[in-house]
Amino acid sequence: YNISFNVNTDSSTLIGTDTFRNNQVELRKGSVYRCAEEGGFGIFDEINMAKNDAASVLHATLDHRRMIDVPGYERIDLHPATRFIGTMNYGYAGTRELNEALVSRFLVIDMPALTKENLYRIIRHDYPEIKEEALDAFGGLFLDLQEKADNSEISTKCMDLRGLLSALGAVKIGLTPWQAVQMGIINKAFDIFEREIVSDMAMTRIPEDWTRENVF
């Protein structure tokens, strides 16, 4: 069960809400309710996007009580196979600090920075036909951006793995590598000075005269 959190997420989104069906009021079960009832994995995607009071309804679900109390309906115990996983990008715009009571109910895995070996493995997995020189160029650009971001010289907006992979996909269907990098990486920086820095870094890695044949 995938539950995408946002600023409008509330308890009714997670647990359920009243609905009118067959001439009577019934509970329309939310994703958390169904996961608790049937078992399986519940994925709280971007858990730090929601307001803390929305996530507070999960407290009894996530601690030793392992139950959900639905006002006006019944109290249900969690299926033994129910597990919940929360994901978040700490520090992203629009996110907030997590409630301490909520954090204490999770085991936290801190994802390390992407290494060169893992980055190349991901790129090769999605684009096995990529040439070695292009792999070094695109992978090297991402690692350069990662180093700049770690040193607080640029923001993390351009250090976008999805953008890098999308740029390669755009090259595959006909864009020049430079155009693809502009749209997938450079233009993610909305500050003009930061964009110039990222553009200069890209120029050192991706020649403007490259074509699709230089990449695939």
Indicate residue ranges for each PLM-predicted region.
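AAA+ P-loop NTPase catalytic core and its hallmark functional loops
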Residues: 1-143, 150, 176, 204, ...
